[in-house]
Amino acid sequence: MWTSKTISFTLFITTTLLGSCNASAKAKTQPLFPAILIFGDSTVDTGNNNYPSQTIFRAKHVPYGIDLPNHSPNGRFSNGKIFSDIIATKLNIKQFVPPFLQPNLTDQEIVTGVCFASAGAGYDDQTSLTTQAIRVSEQPNMFKSYIARLKSIVGDKKAMKIINNALVVVSAGPNDFILNYYEVPSWRRMYPSISDYQDFVLSRLNNFVKELYSLGCRKILVGGLPPMGCLPIQMTAQFRNVLRFCLEQENRDSVLYNQKLQKLLPQTQASLTGSKILYSDVYDPMMEMLQNPSKYGFKETTRGCCGTGFLETSFMCNAYSSMCQNRSEFLFFDSIHPSEATYNYIGNVLDTKIRGWLKA
């Protein structure tokens, strides 16, 4: 028979357990950063290129976005989510990161962060002049407008606290090589050594990080280069490469650049009081998937899912292009950009690294 003491004790235990469960659930869903701020190129551009009229690098047409919830293209260069969205989701910040140039952004979207990246952009201004993208060096101007809007919503003090604690993602660099240095003879004459050009690009990157710091950014994730020689479009560029193997020299270029970047970032952090700068390795995860595709569910790694997969990207990947049905089995969606499945794996690797970085 239940006594009043038994009932009271049972209620106490139940309430305690429920409270503990709720606290645990809340801890798991709490965002690790108050906001996410993203700068760079098409690997992280969530749609800013929908708005400048002069650029040809757009993804606001099918089949881009075919695996998004509404199956609708919105400027992301993949079949679904890209790295920006995936890392924001994993860190419990938001499901999708909106582009800053999107009209009618809500206050909540501003407070939790936006994307300033532009497809076709590079650290080298010459790269963006060729592609008509929003130059990386211009993206802080959008950021300044964002800061003004954020301050109008939450006030100056809270706005700077959000920016100081936001995760800032910087992802650019490949365009400087595949759309510029490798393709423009005059640029190679100015920088006869690839190492010299890498140093120039890295100096631009370093100045960019310092500018973000001057605007209040403190926690900055900086991406390295992927294995550029394994991008389908680069393999296609070598007409004799009938067997479609990775271009080892371009991969060596990526490795050298990444080694220099990993040496540079700790020096930059040491010069910027209170900063935490993390190198984001995309080369090794990509090579792991390329070398062990079946382990990750991939069956095709040398061409994209869109069209022939050898050359199509941006406007060449369109409604008239043939489309693979098994998109999760393709490492690349078009001839340059990874599929959502690939971004997911890279996101998992970096999520683990970021969480460890926060504890350090």
UniProtKB/Swiss-Prot annotation:
Keyword Protein transport carried by entry: no
Principal subcellular localisation of the protein: secreted
Entry keyword annotation includes Signal: yes
Signal peptide positions (record): 1-23
GO molecular function, one term: hydrolase activity, acting on ester bonds
Family membership noted in the UniProt record: Belongs to the 'GDSL' lipolytic enzyme family.
Stated name of the protein: GDSL esterase/lipase At1g58430
